[in-house]
Amino acid sequence: MSRHWSPVVGTLSPYVPGEQPKLPDLIKLNTNENPYGPSPKALQAIAAAAGDTLRLYPDPASDDLRGAIAAAVGVQADQVFVGNGSDEVLAHVFMALFRHGRPVRFPDISYSFYPVYCGLYEIPYQVVPLTDDFRIDPADYQPGGQAAGGIIFPNPNAPTGRALARDEVERIVTANPDTVVVVDEAYVDFGAESVAPLVDRHDNLLVVQTLSKSRSLAGLRVGFALGSRALIDGLERVKNSFNSYPIDRLASAGAQAAMQDQAYFDRTRQAVMATRERMSADLRALGFDVLPSAANFVFARHPEHDAAQLAARLRERSILVRHFRQARIDQFLRITVGTDAQCEALIGALKKIFSS
């Protein structure tokens, strides 16, 4: 606390990121990083960009990167907004599109950065409970009276991993024509349906994605939004009032190459999905309740073992998983899908814990 702080600073409850320990030989299954490295073509592009041109500012419009993203997802380049990770994109979304004085709506169990943004920008919000089986119910997002100041939810949801079908998302968008609906698709490439094809049909729909998960570039920090030209223009106005150069030359080069290497993208995400199904079956065989997942993680609880204690005992064995001290989910563990060997080590450690 400092007397020099702006008044809002003392009211903030900042986001707590997943642990990034520096200890050697850890099996790190706590922050949903891809177990496979970036596309070799992305690494080559980064190396090629690391030359004399680094003395020059990058393209403030990121035209080449936006073009590569547009080609990969099937929209026009002027329907793409890029930022320094999807977290920065989301921060601009809250500033540009959600400050209407009316509550923004999002699930009670969801990405915990959403209420942080609301606190930072002094935006009122309303949480919408998930169903008893941890699903987002489109019927809960039907407007009642005054339009919401915005609607945002991950699909697949995080940390649950459950996904809505494209037609279910469209029901929410169609039912709220006077409200911007933001679909946070950080994990969509691991088995869910993207609603990117709907942005031409609905001018109130914005889709946010990242290269951190399925493109294995969490260390570069590149995210993007897809939407109508009017929504994208609003985001550009906020960005250029904050930082005109969010994407550096190395990140732009690597991200472009990653978006263009479809074969590597498909091969690695299919490998993650196959491992997820094997790990889910192994966890169920050990007595875990495992929610259906369309993400690169699973959300599981054991009826006879406390989740926090399990996380601690796994850590003693150099295996990190994520535990949330939050109502309704404090007995769940979120477990990132690692390599087959990492997931086998997890199952082996759990067997030893249960038998001890």
UniProtKB/Swiss-Prot annotation:
GO molecular function: histidinol-phosphate transaminase activity; pyridoxal phosphate binding
Assembly description: Homodimer.
This protein's name: Histidinol-phosphate aminotransferase 1
Pfam family, one: Aminotran_1_2
Organism: Bordetella bronchiseptica (strain ATCC BAA-588 / NCTC 13252 / RB50) (Alcaligenes bronchisepticus)
SUPFAM superfamilies: PLP-dependent transferases
Enzyme class of the recorded protein, top EC level: transferase
Superkingdom as given in the UniProt entry: Bacteria
Signal sequence range: none
Keyword Transferase: yes
Entry-annotated residues carrying N6-(pyridoxal phosphate)lysine: 213
Swiss-Prot/TrEMBL cofactor(s): pyridoxal 5'-phosphate
GO process annotations (BP): L-histidine biosynthetic process
EC number: 2.6.1.9
Reactions catalysed, as given in the entry: L-histidinol phosphate + 2-oxoglutarate = 3-(imidazol-4-yl)-2-oxopropyl phosphate + L-glutamate
Pathway membership: Amino-acid biosynthesis; L-histidine biosynthesis; L-histidine from 5-phospho-alpha-D-ribose 1-diphosphate: step 7/9
InterPro entries (alphabetical): Aminotrans_II_pyridoxalP_BS, Aminotransferase_I/II_large, HisP_aminotrans, HistidinolP_aminotransfase, PyrdxlP-dep_Trfase, PyrdxlP-dep_Trfase_major, PyrdxlP-dep_Trfase_small
Family: Belongs to the class-II pyridoxal-phosphate-dependent aminotransferase family. Histidinol-phosphate aminotransferase subfamily.
